[in-house]
């Protein structure tokens, strides 16, 4: 069905900036306070109050602009976006419209392979239209009051950076890859804590479809407030199916705002989609134009950390990693630091093995226990020694997994935990040729049927013999040596 249709997706992402106070007032931005305890007269829109720009919010916007190679506007203006909603006391939202603080820029994404669709992993550049500063609205509480709605203005005035892409993504997988890359970037920079459950990072997806080859865009629907990568993927996939089925059944897609219901895994209509003219934007007379000179930009630039994309390129050139692996290992600053700490002890020759372990065994355990790499019970030094013992032939890969789990479970703090466990449990790999030959002779004598099958051309029989040899040594035999000696004796 979808082969006849092209999907067009653009994302608008709201990143809550990690300032201690709000964008136009001195009220706290701390999450979780009792309702309406962090709303000052400015947030309440009391008569006579005036907004004052938060310098920290501006500097975080500058950092983002520099990180994506965008133009940081030397002069931008704030506008009033007029609409009525109970949790918006002023009757308008202070935002930016005609001249945003960040203009253009791009984000490079790594889209993973899809085995079901038989598509390989690939890289794509997503161009950004703009990123602008604005204030968040308050929150309506429907469930706490019978037949009424409560208003919590703690969130009103919280600084947001709204990041808008061009409509260049062509699948839910690309949209998720972009959102994850953007999430990594803003948390890496420290401009947003990225907590999706608390609403610090949320996406609106604009989705439309058009016949393949058609230049004109189809009618789009906007899916609001998607606060998890899974919801983003599911919402887009459902919306694409809905629109295609609607058109093929003779219907027409309506421009509207929709919400995603994660329980039913479907989108539902919320309201008709507004256009810019519906908001009656005009410059806010209470705020001077935002002027950012070159010296300010340079100072902010000098304080920025090394960016994920630069580290990814270094991992590819120095360590021979694939772009996809490098992208995974820079999913957070802590992950990249952990990996580099392991490689610094192991040496570049074992960089790929370190990457495989970090993306495999380590990540598997972290996910199982819902831990961040910074909280890993196995330190980078412990993992480096473990991998060193594989490299020097002291232990096999299978035994290494057992030792890794032992260190993890006992939460060992000594760097030499690997060597201690090897000695205590007698796990040292058997590499003595004479000892291995004796074991192999016993295996061959006890498994004549497998020997005959192998000599008859059945390779599976050889694997069975290796398995028997490893079983006889309780997994401690050097697999490469067993393979070599077994083939010699069978030739």
UniProtKB/Swiss-Prot annotation:
GO annotation, biological process: glutaminyl-tRNAGln biosynthesis via transamidation; translation
Key words, A-Z: ATP-binding, Ligase, Nucleotide-binding, Protein biosynthesis
Protein EC: 6.3.5.-
Top EC category: ligase
Pfam family, one: GatB_N
Matching Gene3D superfamilies: 1.10.10.410, GatB domain, N-terminal subdomain (1.10.150.380)
GO molecular function list: asparaginyl-tRNA synthase (glutamine-hydrolyzing) activity; ATP binding; glutaminyl-tRNA synthase (glutamine-hydrolyzing) activity
PROSITE patterns: GATB
Catalytic function, reaction form: L-glutamyl-tRNA(Gln) + L-glutamine + ATP + H2O = L-glutaminyl-tRNA(Gln) + L-glutamate + ADP + phosphate + H(+); L-aspartyl-tRNA(Asn) + L-glutamine + ATP + H2O = L-asparaginyl-tRNA(Asn) + L-glutamate + ADP + phosphate + 2 H(+)
Key word Nucleotidyltransferase present: no
Domain of life where this protein originates: Bacteria
Keyword Kinase in record: no
Similarity annotation: Belongs to the GatB/GatE family. GatB subfamily.
Subunit note: Heterotrimer of A, B and C subunits.
Primary role: Allows the formation of correctly charged Asn-tRNA(Asn) or Gln-tRNA(Gln) through the transamidation of misacylated Asp-tRNA(Asn) or Glu-tRNA(Gln) in organisms which lack either or both of asparaginyl-tRNA or glutaminyl-tRNA synthetases. The reaction takes place in the presence of glutamine and ATP through an activated phospho-Asp-tRNA(Asn) or phospho-Glu-tRNA(Gln).
Designated name of the protein: Aspartyl/glutamyl-tRNA(Asn/Gln) amidotransferase subunit B
């Amino acid at each position: 069905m979808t082969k006849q249709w092209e999907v067009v997706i653009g994302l608008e992402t709201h990143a809550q900036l990690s300032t201690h106070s709000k964008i136009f007032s001195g009220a706290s931005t701390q999450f979780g306070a009792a309702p309406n305890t962090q709303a000052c007269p400015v947030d309440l829109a009391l008569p006579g109050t005036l907004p004052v720009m938060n310098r920290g919010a501006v500097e975080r916007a500058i950092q983002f602009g520099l990180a994506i190679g965008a133009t940081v506007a030397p002069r931008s203006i704030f506008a009033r976006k007029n609409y009525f909603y109970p949790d918006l006391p002023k009757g308008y939202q202070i935002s930016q419209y005609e001249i945003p603080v960040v203009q253009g820029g791009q984000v490079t994404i790594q889209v993973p392979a899809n085995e079901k669709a038989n598509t390989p992993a690939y890289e794509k550049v997503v161009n950004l239209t703009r990123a602008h500063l604005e204030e968040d609205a308050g929150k309506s509480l429907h469930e706490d009051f019978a037949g009424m709605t409560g208003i919590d203005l703690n969130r009103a005035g919280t600084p947001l950076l709204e990041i808008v892409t061009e409509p260049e993504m062509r699948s839910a997988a690309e949209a998720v890859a972009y959102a994850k890359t953007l999430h990594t970037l803003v948390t890496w920079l420290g401009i947003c804590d990225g907590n999706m459950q608390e609403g610090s990072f949320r996406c609106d997806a604009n989705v439309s479809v058009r016949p393949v080859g058609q230049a004109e865009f189809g009618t789009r629907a906007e899916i609001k407030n998607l606060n998890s990568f899974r919801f983003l993927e599911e919402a887009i996939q459902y919306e694409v199916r809905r629109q295609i089925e609607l058109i093929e059944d003779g219907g027409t897609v309506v421009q509207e705002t929709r919400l995603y219901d994660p329980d039913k895994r479907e989108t539902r209509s919320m309201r008709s989609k507004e256009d810019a003219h519906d908001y009656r934007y005009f410059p806010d007379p209470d705020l001077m134009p935002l002027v950012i000179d070159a010296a300010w930009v340079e100072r902010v630039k000098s304080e920025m950390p090394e960016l994920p994309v630069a580290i990814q390129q270094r991992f590819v050139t120095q360590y021979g990693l694939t772009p996809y692996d490098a992208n995974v290992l820079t999913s957070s600053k802590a992950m990249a630091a952990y990996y580099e700490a392991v490689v610094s002890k192991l040496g570049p020759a074992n960089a790929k093995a370190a990457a495989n372990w970090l993306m495999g065994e380590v990540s598997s355990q972290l996910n199982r226990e819902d831990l961040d790499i910074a909280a890993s019970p196995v330190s980078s030094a412990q993992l480096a020694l473990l991998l060193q013992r594989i490299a020097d032939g002291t232990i096999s890969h299978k035994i290494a997994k057992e030792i890794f789990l032992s260190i993890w479970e006992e939460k060992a703090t000594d760097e030499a935990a690997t060597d201690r466990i090897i000695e205590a449990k007698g796990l040292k790999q058997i590499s003595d040729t004479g000892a291995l030959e004796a074991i192999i002779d016993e295996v061959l004598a006890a498994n004549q049927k497998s020997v005959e099958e192998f000599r008859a051309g059945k390779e599976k029989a050889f694997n069975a013999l290796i398995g028997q040899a490893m079983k006889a040594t309780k997994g401690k035999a050097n697999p490469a040596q067993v393979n070599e000696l077994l083939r010699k004796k069978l030739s």
